[in-house]
Amino acid sequence: MGSLLPKLSSGKYPTGSKGVTPRYASGDISSVTGTSGAGRHGYNARMTTFTLQPGRVPLLISLPHDGFFIPADIAERMHPAARRSPDTDWHVARLYEPLAQALGASVLKPQASRYVVDLNRPADGHALYPGQRETGLVSTIGFDGEALYRDGLEPDQDEVRRRIDEYWRPYHQALAQELDRLCNEHGRAVLWEGHSIRSRVPMLFEGRLPDFNLGTASGASCTPALQERLQSCLASQSRFSFAVNGRFKGGYITRHYGAPETGVQAVQLELAQLNYMDEDSFAYDEARASSVQELIGLLLQTCLA
């Protein structure tokens, strides 16, 4: 199959740094760590930018907003509240990794916060939802609409390009290579985008968000059959509310990599965080999370059926 790597605005494919190529062999699912030359934005000469746990089944779970690390020279220019990275998809790795291990699925997650660079946005900065307010590739505002940086200390275009090189490209290189590997081994692959957000974000949507928000790029990123099976799985329970292709239809990753005709299907799940954590303190709630995790597990199994 053709390369899954996303083209940048230059028309070229992103080139990854050393260390991003997955090391895999028959029966080998050892963890892979991605590194990049950190330059002025790193805490040492080479920094870890993501981790990939290769699996043995045709399912890759991508958690692009799980990271919360902000390099010191970026954090020192931010307002104190922004340094906490409050718009992180808190604890999604804690929800997904036990399920991935049980199923044999691959897991890809970053180290850095979405405030450093948003891995679920196109590298050219084009809007995902034209006409609606949203945060960008290297955002200068948070979900509350407040400025992230102190006056005059926002990143310039050179810094934006460096962040793309150091964080965005290696993640997408690894994602594309892992999908290629799964397709080569199994003839198909499902890319599952795991996300979460506060249940109420007035800047992005009105009222309270449904508990489970499934996005398939309005049906373009997966087959009708898979979308129907996933929707039936959600409809078979009554504990959690859900929406399909509602406010969240799938971000850049779902839209770019989901191409059913090539054997790659992509689905995004946006969870309302109040179902598994305290939205004010960011504390994980084991009791509430267990039911959420159980339903996610059923959805992931549906992808492999």
Where are the language model's segments positioned?
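Terminal low-complexity, poorly structured segments
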Residues: 1-4, 56
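N-terminal catalytic or cofactor-binding beta/alpha core of small enzyme domains
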Residues: 42-191, 196-305
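Alpha-helical transmembrane segments and their juxtamembrane interfaces
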Residues: 17, 22, 28-31, 121, ...
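Low-acidity, Ser/Thr- and Arg-rich intrinsically disordered low-complexity segments
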Residues: 3, 9-13, 17, 23-26, ...
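Conserved N-terminal helical subregion
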Residues: 39
